[in-house]
């Protein structure tokens, strides 16, 4: 379970979830009809090695990401989610945003793979160990960012707005923000502070996009935590998830930003999956209940 002030690198705790997601993106890229291709996701997995590389090589047919009940749907989800936020950034850039803020950047490689307009600065905020790993892996592959990239080594539970300003962020200029796969790892109070910080720093003609999710019922959540603990104790190839999230009720993101003058659009994940031609998991599957609680939100400030 999480504790106040806990820390991690790319292979532990919350950091390891970035590897899990990168593996899913790499598996999506292996398809004959990928929704998106992240050319660097596989590099991150192979840099760590072990099961992260083996699953890409088909050596772990029993890996969670290979299961029909969860894994196949999760890979679809990551392909769809990545596509959603890629398209969001393209729209924001076309509308004039030249400052991009990636909160809890993890193994996000958009600074390297999206066609940013001239004059764009991408601010990546995350823990220093995570940023170091990403920079070293990308450098070893000769990757070059396609915009000015600025790393900001900060915990989002600390004073990240000041760190962002200290790195050259201009609150008076349009900006585009993203919180992808982040909110579930924040307690409700931290999410409120995060949204408040975005609202305070984002000027006119700015944009924000987040992945939002409703909490599980307390009994269902407790059962999932115990089930996960038991599987890990028995030596299963299980990556902690439920033990890392904060299952706390927060104001829906679209509602929160809408009440503060933003024009927000919320799209249910399952509706987006259908729109991009990917199957929606049934309610009886392991992935089904999680997907049904998930919403993709984008908002603009005029």
Curated annotation (Swiss-Prot):
Root EC class: transferase
Residues the record lists as binding S-adenosyl-L-methionine: 126, 155-156
One Pfam family this sequence matches: LCM
Keyword hit for Transferase: yes
GO molecular function, one term: methyltransferase activity
Biological function: Exhibits S-adenosyl-L-methionine-dependent methyltransferase activity.
Protein name: Putative S-adenosyl-L-methionine-dependent methyltransferase Rv0281
Organism for this UniProt entry: Mycobacterium tuberculosis (strain ATCC 25618 / H37Rv)
Organism taxonomic ancestry: Bacteria, Bacillati, Actinomycetota, Actinomycetes, Mycobacteriales
